[in-house]
Amino acid sequence: ELRKDPLLISLAGTKKKTEEARTLLTDSEKTAFFFVTLPLALPIAVIERFISWVQAFQIPVGGVIVNEVIPKADTEKLSPYVANRMQEQMGYLKLAEEKFPGMIRAVLPLYEKEVNGLEMVSRMAQSLSLGSESKI
């Protein structure tokens, strides 16, 4: 009998919590997963796999954010290494747009220092509010 068996009581509680979590996670009015990637082959492939896993459970995907993109600059003024990285990143940004059509919500720059503290968080928030319209 359920009322007398502590294991069954615990399992019933776990089942209820799991059902509540599933209901919340699959409710597109309350939940959406956003994935953050870098403009590199492996992180893009990982996010692609994660998105398919999340969608398999009917969990809404809100979009993809591409982080740490080197801002556009006059390549003649850059070191060959940085100029090459910029070119590589442009190719990976195109790949991300192909793999996640209509899902890129923001492209965030590579900042000169780690995002730490109010000033940097404010800059990151501003970049996020610009979304994919930001000029990187």
Show the residue positions of the predicted features.
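A general structural motif
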Residues: 10-19
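C-terminal lobe/tail of nucleotide-utilizing enzymes
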Residues: 18-136
